[in-house]
Amino acid sequence: MLLLLARCFLVALASSLLVCPGLACGPGRGFGKRQHPKKLTPLAYKQFIPNVAEKTLGASGRYEGKITRNSERFKELTPNYNPDIIFKDEENTGADRLMTQRCKDKLNALAISVMNQWPGVKLRVTEGWDEDGHHSEESLHYEGRAVDITTSDRDRSKYGMLARLAVEAGFDWVYYESKARIHCSVKAENSVAAKSDGCFPGSATVHLEQGGTKLVKDLSPGDRVLAADDQGRLLYSDFLTFLDRDEGAKKVFYVIETREPRERLLLTAAHLLFVAPHNDSGPTPGPSPLFASRVRPGQRVYVVAERGGDRRLLPAAVHSVTLREEAAGAYAPLTADGTILINRVLASCYAVIEEHSWAHRAFAPFRLAHALLAALAPARTDGGGGGSIPAPQSVAEARGAGPPAGIHWYSQLLYHIGTWLLDSETLHPLGMAVKSS
């Protein structure tokens, strides 16, 4: 009963916090204060994002076979009749309107961005699903997972920005392919890479208050791990639970490496870490939360440095960003302070939304309930026979039972509320693969 009441309280309070997200992003230099608006940079000619081959797991994934009108998979394609999109349809068969649902969703989001960027201009699709064999072998056009696009006015000076808007709309791979068009593609609907959640590999390490390190996968409630407060000061924070835990997961991780000092952090695309401002002098904004998929060489992340016997966080330039597929499991630890040092690099405990402060406030009810249950449950007994009444789940975890596998129910709750209240572009396209509880 106590656990049920706690859950009801959490649902109500979390909903109220998410309805007014603006309360979470005031001015200041603390961690998690993201700058707005975001400046968009056009793609250069022949540039592609992400900087990997199209048919790799880190982009749109492998080719799964050509779809014809007579194949069983033809039902996977859906027509797009969005009036804000112009379809060239040079074949006069309507083929260019056919695409997977994921491709359709991204294309519709891009159409809105185009009209906002250039009033009076619409998105134009020159090629969608192809059934005539006009493309290279294993082209994703044959699966309805790729589109070639321009603007309706065919102004080529706009195409670099059009490509950037496609990236922001959530296409899994965008290529400024030629002076005449932009090529975009998406992952397959059933792809294991379609959702990455926000996690670290089980082989990642954290620093413990009592000294030494521990693998992320071995963390248990009661551990105190190295983290940072909202001013960037190092401290030890209570590990509360895993927001996601999948021991057998095979994930694609972004590998972010620095040279001075030499550190390496692996995390999934939708996870947040903190990037230092370009200029530390003057009244500049504080560190910004950034999706791992958006980190680029030359940006600076925060690492632990030892100077004169003093340990502090210092910005270190990112030397390289690569992709690696690992089968070491995937873990998303939550601390009381919402931050954690993984492999000596500062990261957020949150993912999916690029607003650390919003996420941390949304988890305030969970932290409060966790503290109350931990304080009350150990003292509960049956009063007669001396036997203990079973403790709520969160307290049982603290007694060594360990958190359950999968995505935490509170994370799923916030994600569903977020999809109702927030614009789809606010959420990372590789956000959460919600599992049934």
From Swiss-Prot:
Residues that carry a glycan: 279
Indicate which residues form the motif Cardin-Weintraub.
33-39
Example GO molecular function: zinc ion binding
Q: Where is this site: Involved in cholesterol transfer?
A: 244
Tell whether DNA-binding is among the UniProt keywords.
Answer: no
Q: Which InterPro entries match?
A: Hedgehog (IPR001657), Hedgehog_Hint (IPR001767), Hedgehog_sig/DD-Pept_Zn-bd_sf (IPR009045), Hedgehog_Signaling (IPR050387), Hedgehog_signalling_dom (IPR000320), Hint_dom_C (IPR003586), Hint_dom_N (IPR003587), Hint_dom_sf (IPR036844)
At which residues is there a site annotated Cleavage?
198-199
Fill in the subunit field for this protein. Answer: Interacts with HHATL/GUP1 which negatively regulates HHAT-mediated palmitoylation of the SHH N-terminus. Interacts with BOC and CDON. Interacts with HHIP. Interacts with DISP1 via its cholesterol anchor. Interacts with SCUBE2. Interacts with glypican GPC3.
In Swiss-Prot or TrEMBL terms, this protein is called: Sonic hedgehog protein
Question: Where does this protein come from, organism-wise?
Answer: Rattus norvegicus
